[in-house]
Every structure is written in C-alpha cells, then in structure tokens.
Amino acid sequence: MKALRLIIISLILIAVASPVFPASAVLKVQVSPEVWQDTANGATADFLVILRSQADINTLAVAPMAAAQRGERVYQALRQAANAAQPTLQAELQARQVLFRSYWIVNMLVVHGDQALVAYLATRPDVEYIEPDRPFKANLETPDTTTIKVQSPTTPTAVSLTPQWNLNTVHAPDLWARGVTGKGIVYATADTGVQWNHPALQNQYRGWDGTTADHNYNWWDAVHASETWGGLTNICGFDLQAPCDDYGHGTHVTGIGVGTGDGVTAIGVAPGARWIACRNMNGGFGKPSTYIECLQFFMAPTNLQGSAPDPSKRADVISNSYSCPQISEGCAPHSLRAAVQAVRAAGIFMSVSSGNEGGLGCSSIIDPPGLEASVFTVGNTDSSNVIAPSSSRGPVTIDGYNLLKPNLVAPGTIVYSSWSNNTFTTLTGTSMSAPHVAGAVALLWSAFHWLKNDVFATELLLEITAKPLTSSQGCGGDSPTAVPNNVYGYGLLDILASYNMAISKLEKIYLPFLTK
C-alpha cells in the first residue's frame, strides 16, 4: 500500500511539474505554441477557441440559388451552427467568470484567460483549435508627400472632374461615360477606420441621407477596450459609435474605391456606390479577432449595440488592404481561412492586397488573407504598368501547395486619394491596388445585375479581360512569356474590356455558365 501511495504521489508530482503543452497531442485539440507562451508564468491573454462543429460552407457555396437568397441562407447556416454548438461552452465560461466574445462567421469564441483555462479547454471534445489573438503591427503605407487641403466641394459622381492617372489606366472613366458609376452596390472597407464626413466621401456613405447621419448598420468598431492591446491607447478611443480614422490609411483606400475628388481631380473608381466600414486596427495594430469581426459585420450588419443583424444590408464587395502575419506573429490560419470562405459563399467579392514583401523575391505572398485561394489577390504596378519592387510575388507555397498568385495587378504606386482631416495625399503599396479591383467589381455589378454576387464568374471575367503582362523573374518556374504568371497574375486590370466582353455577350462563348 505504501508503495502504491508513493507511485500515486510521484505521478501527481510529474503531472504538476510537466508543462501542459504535450496534453494537446493526446487530446486531439491543436493548441498553438504561442498560446502557451502568452499564458506562461501566470500571465493571461486573449486567444481564439475554434469549435469542431462548423457549418457546411462548401455545399452552400456551390448550391444553385438566387443571388438575393445566397447571403441570407449562408448567414442562417452559420448562425444555426454556432447556436447549436456554443451554449454549453458559454455557460461554463460564464460560471468561471471568464470574459469572452462569441462569433458565428466562424464557430468560435475569443476568450481571455490563463494557462489553466487553456488546459481545460484543450480537454473539451467540442474544441478543435486554440490559437493566439495577439495584437501585431500591420505593414501599412505612409504618405509619400505632404498632404494638401481640399480645394473645393466635390460632386456626387465625380464624372466632371479630371481623373487621376490610375483611374485612366484601368479605364474607369470609360464606364462613367456610359452612365455606370457603381450605383446600387454596397462597398465595404475594413481598415483603420474612415473619416466619414470627408468631402470626397460623405455623400457616398450609406449612413448619410444628405442631412443627418445614421451609423446603425453602416459602421462597426471591432477595436474593443475590453480586450488586450498591450497597453496601446487610441486617438479616436475604443468601441466607437461613429466612424473615425485613427491613422489615415482607411480613408485613403476608401477614396480609391468610391471617392469623388478634391474639386479638380477625380480619385475613386466607383463614385456612385455607397460605402460602409468597420475598423479592424488600433492605430495600425490588428488582431485576428478584429479582422474576423469586421468580415462578420459585412455579412450581416448590426445596429451600434451589435444586435439585430440583418444580412439584407450586407456588403456586395469588400476591399481589404491589410495582412495578418502568419510566420512572424502567429496569426491564426484556421479561423481567418474559414471566415473568408464564408464571405465568398455568401456571394461577397473580396479584393485583397498581395502584400509589400516583394523584397523577399518569389513566393513572398506569405500572409493571410492574400494567400488564400478563396480571395482575389492584387499586386501593385506603377504608371508604366511595371510591377513595383515591393509588391509580393507568388506562387503561394506556405501551405504546401503551389498556388498561382496574384490574380492580377492594378495601380498602387504614388496613388492620390483622400486622407484624414479633409486632406489628400499619395501613397504607394498593394493597399492602393486592392480598392481598384473592388471598385471595378462595383461598376460591373452595377451594370450587369446577372453578374452580381457571382464571385467565381466575376473573377474569371476580370482575369480573361486583363491586359497581359509578362515577367522574366521566373517565379514558380514561369517562362518569360507565361501568362498568367506569379508576378502579374493574368495581367493589368482593364474594366472597359470586362464591360465590353459582358455587354457584347462574348461570355456565351468564353463563359457559357455565365448566361442567365
């Protein structure tokens, strides 16, 4: 008996002395090493708890249904999966007085706790992944020149203004001349916020009726004071009830997509579209949860209290000029991937910057969401249609497959647009390229309702009609004449060519599945 007691005591001591980390392999719950690091030595941290039960998005994505129904049906499926799986876990967390925030776009929760809580969650059969939710510094562009003051009031359509070079390059004014400005399309920006009353943006804000502003269902702030930000403060504050841009970057990229102009020159691709926005960064610092929360808001916008979601008010197209560092910061790959797949299944087009890591050479598209097959990834060219040295290249190899990226390229070098405090400036980076494609989709979907919310068909149309560009860099083994290739993708965005192919019904030859 004494020997048995000694064995039991020894086993207990071994269990206490041993790190919790190895338990994850036995329990089949994948716990990221960063989570153990963040909660070591009695520390607490935010982390993502992703449940094993997820909605069957793949089936919904290919199921035949009207465009108007797609967003509603995908939303309902996601909500039902979360409502069925989360109650027992939420009850346990509440009983333990643990702070958490639940999501449905991915069946997951953001939880704040210590290592003992992580160890407990790793024993639950309903949990599949536990991943970090660290704040990280986003690689955002800064102004190339001193900002200038707005010169005069702008017009709602901007068609009377002189277009900036980048708009002429992608042939946006050619569609304006045909009466196509993006009317009827909801354009969404997830970024550092937006100065909603900027003269180049106010009239296009969906929350502005010309007299008063209503930010319900048009704005959401995913930067919460209750979550861990490593001591970061914010010039705008937290949990904002009205749009604010704490950096300027969000105002700039929104201007490229839907801005009017400075009274002399036009800046936006689709100035007739209406925009909504969500802040997913705190002064340039993002978190996986803030990125996911904004995508959820765009799928089913809510009131300012975060309740009464309404998928009928969802975005049509989302412009994403950010990356979530997977290697350097441990950004959660599983949760972000599931979120962008859900967005696509809902018929929402997602234009994403390829990243500014071109200095690393080939296969420098290394961060989500730009590396995902389910998003449309955009590289940066200059006014001579030459790839920018900083623009990240493909192929994507980080997940063990050889995915051709980017999909195509668009202007991103010295692009003039709106900036904070009613000013304008130029910036350079792939952040400037992605809104060109998002704006292009707004124009095409406004012109062709049969194309709206058909993400795959739209991607194919953009790729087929892009201006072919070649590279001798040889990324992914590409020949110097290869099109597509891993530097330019299918080539330079050409909105007029896309429009002409659609309106001349050439899609019946090249894209038979497009005919409605």
What annotation goes with each model-predicted range?
Residues 253, 307, 311-419, 463-466:
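Catalytic-core segments of hydrolase enzymes
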Residues 36, 42, 60-61, 129, ...:
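Subtilisin-like serine protease catalytic core
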